[in-house]
A protein has these predicted regions:
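Structured binding elements
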Residues: 10
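Jelly-roll (double-stranded beta-helix
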Residues: 1, 5-6, 16, 20-121
Length: 121
C-alpha cells in the first residue's frame, strides 16, 4: 500500500485484478476487469494485486510528475517477468522518497492481506 499526491485513473485493458481504494470511510478491495475504470484521488492510500495467472495491462492517466517516476523505476515490458533484485528494491525505495511517496508498513499492508518482505532504504 502506498500514497502520493498525484491522482491516478486506471482503465483496465487486459487481465483481472483487485484494487484497494477508499470506500465508505475505509479501504476496500474492488475487483476490476477489462473495460473497468478506477479513479484514485491524490493522497489516497491504495494498492493493486493481480489475482489471476494472466498479466494485467492498465491505461494509466496521471500527472507528468508521476509519469517521470514510472519512467525512473519501471522495467521494460520486454524484460522477462522476474522478482525485483535487492538493488532494484533499494532504488525504488530511494525514488519513492525523492518523489514524496509514502509506503505503508508491513503491518499496515498485512491488515489488508498484503504480505511484503521487510526491506529498508
Amino acid at each position: 500500500m502506498h500514497r502520493h499526491e498525484d491522482p491516478e485513473d486506471f482503465y483496465v485493458l487486459a487481465g483481472s485484478k483487485e484494487v484497494l481504494i477508499p470506500q465508505g470511510g475505509g479501504l476496500a478491495w474492488v475487483s476490476v476487469h477489462p473495460g473497468d475504470y478506477i479513479k484514485v484521488p491524490g493522497n489516497a492510500v491504495h494498492a493493486h494485486r493481480n489475482v489471476s495467472h494472466e498479466p494485467v495491462i492498465d491505461l494509466i492517466i496521471t500527472t507528468a510528475r508521476m509519469g517521470r517516476f514510472f519512467t525512473e523505476v519501471g522495467r521494460p515490458l520486454t524484460d522477462p517477468p522476474t522478482p525485483p533484485t535487492p538493488e532494484q528494491l533499494a532504488m525504488f525505495m530511494r525514488k519513492s522518497a525523492e518523489y514524496g511517496h509514502t509506503l505503508c508498513s508491513a503491518e499496515e499492508n498485512a491488515a489488508y492481506g498484503i504480505n511484503v518482505p521487510p526491506f529498508s532504504m
